[in-house]
Amino acid sequence: MPALLKRLLFQVGPHPNERTFTLSSVSTDGHYISLRXFVKPSGDELSFPFEWAFAGTNETVKVNDQGNGVVTQDFNFWLDTNVYLNVPNTHRGEVNTTWKNWDSGCVEETGAVYPFGADKESVSFRELWQPVDPSREDLVIVSPNNEKFSSNARSIVLKVTDEAYDGLVIVIGRWIQGFFVPKE
């Protein structure tokens, strides 16, 4: 079943700081995209008003069900704006995460990245996600009481790889996300 998630919280270090309106989409077959646009971009952010955008195919993520509502997911992004823009001090390579379902229906994601290199100290992060109903036009919360959710929403994936561009577009129910990057 496809999924649409709204990020509620982003935390690195002791203080949460959510400056984006982030939605992540997952297709029925496991393709994923996450667009993290700044709510109030300023300064240099105005030229590219995204904290980050990344996407991948079901071949670039390893998922393992640990039981009791816990899943590990190891991502190796196929498309990554930090790589494309050559942003300094950003993680490269696989990101290992743990996802835990809360009784409220929210999903906590934790992990660590290595922005200064794999041989340097890691930086832990925490994100809190709220599943939303992809068949609705508004952001309608799914499973507020941890009830089983089913939807007739379908997913469509368009992957572009040609001599000029790489890109991924995912349609989940009534929602669409995508981005393309020119090849150098």
Curated annotation (Swiss-Prot):
GO terms for cellular component: cytoplasm; nucleus. Its main location: cytoplasm. Transmembrane segments: none annotated. Coiled coil: none annotated. InterPro entries: Hri1, Hri1_N, Hri1_N_sf. The modification Phosphoserine is found at residue 143. It is found in: Cytoplasm; Nucleus. Gene3D superfamilies: Protein HRI1, C-terminal domain, Protein HRI1, N-terminal domain. CDD domains: HRI1_N_like (cd11692). Keywords: Cytoplasm, Nucleus, Phosphoprotein. It comes from the Eukaryota. Belongs to the HRI1 family. Interacts with HRR25. May interact with SEC72. This is Protein HRI1. The gene is HRI1.
